[in-house]
Regions:
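Hydrophobic/aromatic-rich structural module bridging two neighboring secondary-structure elements via a short loop
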Residues: 1-20
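Ferredoxin-type iron-sulfur electron-transfer modules in oxidoreductases and energy-metabolism complexes
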Residues: 16-191
Length: 191
């Protein structure tokens, strides 16, 4: 049904190509490990210190839940970063004689210096606004203020236009900027 609708709107046919911002593995399959690395950089999770039953979690308002829910729908598809002019392709090839560990370290360093992208910024905001995740907000903000952080975003807003889940990515990026401003002032005056 979806293909029929796409072909109906494009009677001349459609062309399928792999994403251009990620290394191609084969055919239409791309290596999205860079996206997962950005999630690691911003610590897009809530650390747990055990698996035992700790009872009910912190209570929160319906309004707070409704703000965060759209951000939780991200499926890390990569459409937002594919459309982003600031998210440049980073393709590192293994040098001859280079061990797998050396190659991986060099690749991770290149990923860590490049723009995070809207998906990672949005996920950082999701967890910073979570009652339990808030305790690690400063670590996430530190990552967002580092190389390739929020300051690289040129506000082209292509990300929000192409997101298949209609996630308010530009709103998340703006919130990240506001949180970073407060964080930087706190760091400046807490010395």
């Amino acid at each position: 049904a979806l293909v029929d609708r796409v072909l109906e709107n494009n009677p001349g046919g459609i062309e399928l190509r792999p994403m251009s911002k990620f290394p191609v593995l084969r055919d239409l399959v791309v290596d999205r490990s860079r996206m997962y690395r950005t999630l690691e950089r911003v610590k897009a999770w809530i650390p747990v210190d055990g698996y035992g039953d700790r009872g009910a979690g912190p209570r929160e308002s319906q309004a707070s839940q409704e703000v965060r829910y759209p951000l939780s729908e991200c499926m890390t598809c990569g459409c937002c970063v594919e459309a982003c002019p600031q998210f440049a392709k980073v393709e590192i090839l293994q040098r001859s004689g280079e061990t797998d560990a050396e190659f991986t370290a060099r690749q991770q360093q290149a990923y860590d210096e490049s723009f995070l992208g809207a998906a990672a910024i949005s996920q950082a905001m999701l967890f910073n606004d979570h009652p339990t995740g808030h305790m690690n907000a400063d670590e996430r903000l530190e990552a967002l203020s580092g190389p390739g952080g929020v300051q690289v975003c040129g506000n082209a807003q292509n990300c929000v236009a192409v997101c298949p889940k209609s996630i308010p990515l530009t709103t998340s990026i703006a919130r990240a900027g506001r949180q970073l401003t407060g964080y930087m002032f706190r760091r400046l005056f807490d010395r």
